[in-house]
UniProtKB/Swiss-Prot annotation:
E.C. designation(s): 6.5.1.2
Keywords, in A-Z order: DNA damage, DNA repair, DNA replication, Ligase, NAD
Species whose genome carries this gene: Pectobacterium carotovorum subsp. carotovorum (strain PC1)
InterPro entries: DNA_ligase, DNA_ligase_AS, DNA_ligase_B, DNAligase_adenylation, DNAligase_N, NA-bd_OB-fold, NAD_dep_DNA_ligaseB, NAD_DNA_ligase_OB
Classification lineage: Bacteria, Pseudomonadati, Pseudomonadota, Gammaproteobacteria, Enterobacterales
Protein's name according to its UniProt entry: DNA ligase B
Length: 562
């Protein structure tokens, strides 16, 4: 969690180009409400910090924590601009850095990136490895201390743990008497693809290991990437060569000169999509020329910026909870979200599932949820990561009001299920009526022309023509399409009305009349493919339901009984 290991910047320069769902617009809260929300979120973050520091593990995904911490500071900027959420340090082991750790401004707007590169000479690009920052201090070639980033000025003493990491040398030759290096401790991965796998909480694994009282085998899985050498060689090639000689060759392998935004974009894309030995959360652009280390501060550096990747988990505010009823009476719940970007997709809705699932999630407007992309790029609700302090309850539909035999007739309450029945009826699984889809059914419903799912059979061309915006030709075509249903066999009508016979058993309806179907037993139905005991009972219940019996009688009166 980056605020625990690096400096927080209350001003996010350049924005994040839609990647984060943390909005820059201040909420419409009074002072009382804003204080409640800020205090509650601060307390939640502090609780997570306690777990992080005492147990060495993260209760939430790293990128989720980062976004909520960013949200807190955004609220502070709106309502308490004199306050900044400070970085907490543990109560033990505070140690000063010989050279301060700077922060990184974050840019993602193309024009700003182009301008930043154009205004500088000798620019290089590196992956922004997602680990924990550390200072290494060598005295006369001997590793004397290792300090976590902390607040950029002081951090925890990690010396003993760092000495147990195989990749970090204890002794160096041909180096200055005082050598200060800053870098990233990271969890070594095999063929990690950031755009597919995300952060996998690798940062928390490393941080947890560094805070364990007793070392574990995880130490052997930790690597180090040096990204700063205060007061080091003046040119980047010389710097990289010296680091390689010291044993830090990875820096040279993943540091490349760039001359344009196109060069930066190429590496940004390549490292996001191709396998790497570490987790990344973006790239870092840096110029070789840097001030002397004594002038560094724990604020944003002028000589380097970060161009981040979109978080694998996006935190979004819930705007509304939408309930829908399907043809069979199944209730589904969808969350409307503040528009966010997941990879290259704009997302404003995420499916929750059933009504009972929504109740389990306990999510309401104003809450924050974590969303990611599942298979085939479908948005997935991962978790409710923050609940607002003032939550207005929502009255949801009753599951008892909707079922397989509800809403064959129109009413205000039944509008969704009734429309779904008509869409199924006119679709490819039913009567396949040309030009009659949900929009047409909705217009007929709004004009009061549909009392039940068969009312349309008796509509005249004149009635259709009277529908607003229909027109003579359109009315004629729709009338012709509706009347074509009279030529359909009874088996198609039964399927259109919702008879729950699977496709694999449709042949069961061939050459069998209505009375015979009603008298079939469960055993007879179960002889067909895809029909088990439960499905057979559902079919029999459908065929004997009073509403269905009435509809079949009406069809018979219309001459549809084959």
């Amino acid at each position: 969690m980056w605020l625990r290991v690096c400096t927080f910047l209350i001003i996010i320069v350049g924005g994040i180009s839609g990647f984060s769902a943390v909005a820059g617009v201040c909420p419409d809260w009074d002072n009382t409400r804003s204080k409640k929300e800020i205090d509650a979120l601060r307390q939640q973050l502090e609780q997570w910090d306690d777990v992080y520091y005492t147990e060495g593990k993260s209760p939430v995904a790293d990128d989720v924590y980062d976004q909520l911490r960013e949200q807190l500071n955004q609220w502070l900027g709106c309502f308490q601009p004199q306050s900044v959420a400070s970085v907490r340090l543990p109560d033990h082991g505070k140690q000063l850095h010989p050279v301060a750790h700077t922060g990184l401004k974050k840019l993602s707007d193309r024009e700003q990136l182009v301008q930043w590169i154009a205004q500088r000479e000798d620019v290089w690009i590196q992956p922004k490895i997602d680990g924990v920052a550390v200072t290494l201090v060598y005295q006369h070639g001997k590793l004397e201390s290792a300090v976590s980033r902390g607040n950029g000025l002081q951090g925890e003493d990690w010396t003993e743990k760092v000495r147990l990491i195989p990749e970090i040398p204890h002794l160096l030759t041909n180096v200055p008497s005082l050598l200060v290096l800053q870098g990233e401790l990271f969890l070594k991965m095999t063929d990690h693809r950031q755009h597919i796998q995300g952060g996998v909480n690798a940062r928390s694994v490393v941080a947890g290991e560094m805070r364990r009282h007793q070392p574990s085998p995880v130490l052997s899985q930790i690597g180090l990437f040096i990204w700063e050498w205060p007061d080091g060689p003046k040119t980047m090639p010389e710097r990289l060569e010296k680091l390689t000689e010291m044993g830090f060759a990875m820096t040279a392998d993943y540091t490349h000169a760039i001359g344009s935004f196109a060069d930066a974009e190429k590496w940004h894309h390549y490292w996001y999509h191709n396998p790497l030995p570490f987790v990344t959360d973006g790239v870092v652009l840096r110029q070789t020329k840097e001030p002397q280390g004594r002038y560094w501060r724990n604020t944003s550096a002028d000589w380097a910026i970060a161009w981040k990747y979109p978080p694998f988990h996006q935190v979004a505010e819930v705007i509304d909870v939408v309930f829908s009823v399907g043809r069979t009476g199944k209730l589904a719940v969808v969350l409307k979200l503040n528009l966010l970007k997941l990879d290259d997709k704009s997302v404003s809705r995420v499916n929750v599932g059933s009504l009972s699932r929504w109740k389990q999630w306990d999510v309401l407007p104003g809450d924050r949820v974590s969303v990611s992309l599942a298979g085939q790029g479908i948005p997935r609700l991962d978790n409710v990561v923050w609940r607002s302090t003032e939550r207005l309850p929502i009255v949801s539909p009753s599951e008892h009001d909707f079922h397989a035999f509800s809403c064959f007739r129109y009413s205000t309450v039944c509008q969704q299920q009734f429309l779904a029945r008509l869409v199924w009826l006119s679709g490819e699984h039913g009567l396949n009526l040309t030009g009659v889809r949900d929009g047409m059914w909705l217009r007929l419903m709004q004009h009061g022309l549909l009392e039940d799912v068969l009312s349309w059979l008796s509509l005249t061309e004149a009635q259709l023509n009277a529908v607003t915006g229909m027109g003579d030709k359109r009315a004629r075509d729709i009338y012709k399409s509706l009347q074509s249903a009279r030529q359909m066999p009874l088996s198609r009508w039964l399927l259109a009305l919702g008879l729950p016979v699977p496709r694999s058993a449709i042949s069961a309806l061939n050459h069998v009349n209505w009375l015979a179907l009603q008298q079939w037993t469960a055993q007879q139905w179960r002889q067909f493919s895809g029909i088990g005991e439960r499905r057979a009972e559902e079919i029999m219940a459908f065929l004997k339901h009073p509403a269905v019996v009435e509809f079949i009688a009406r069809l018979d009166a219309e001459g549809i009984h084959r």
